[in-house]
């Protein structure tokens, strides 16, 4: 009976140790696959969008960016400003506004509206009040992400 209990304890300790050892690798693989799927889904929705809708979204974002330049003294956006912000470049309704690709580190990450904790747990956040990522003069787009989250390793 003692030998049987010792064997069970040894097996449990081995499985626990193996799980702890494999967790970083499995977690990294899982998060990479999740990011790839999210970006692929977003890309597919953008591809299916009508060209007029795409152009209208970009024009709206450029207009928003122009408004930021004229309101540069305001640091706290109003509720209507936030509502407008979250509606721009939100093609698939998930809050994702695009993605960033860094070929040198084989990294493709979703960019979401805002830098709330819930957003930063799953991807990169765009800082409200900074320019939307559509380019142009006098634009400064700020994104934020964590490198060493327990749930995801971004920019690595």
Regions found by a protein language model. Name each.
Residues 3, 7, 13-156:
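Solvent-exposed, non-transmembrane regions of membrane-associated and secreted proteins
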């Amino acid at each position: 009976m003692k030998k049987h209990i010792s064997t069970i304890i040894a097996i449990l300790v081995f499985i626990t140790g193996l799980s702890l050892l494999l967790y970083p690798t499995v977690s990294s693989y899982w998060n990479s696959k999740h990011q790839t799927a999210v970006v692929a889904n977003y890309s597919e929705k953008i591809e299916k969008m009508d060209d007029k809708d795409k152009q209208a979204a970009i024009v709206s974002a450029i207009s928003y960016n122009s408004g930021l330049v004229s309101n540069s003294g305001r640091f706290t956006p109003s509720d209507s400003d936030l509502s407008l912000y979250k509606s721009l470049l939100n093609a698939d309704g998930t809050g994702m506004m695009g993605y960033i690709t860094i070929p040198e580190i084989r990294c493709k990450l979703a960019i979401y509206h805002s830098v709330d904790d819930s957003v930063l747990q799953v991807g990169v956040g765009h800082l409200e009040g900074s320019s939307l990522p559509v380019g142009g003069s006098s634009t400064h787009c700020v994104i934020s992400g964590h490198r060493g989250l327990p749930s995801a390793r971004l920019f690595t």
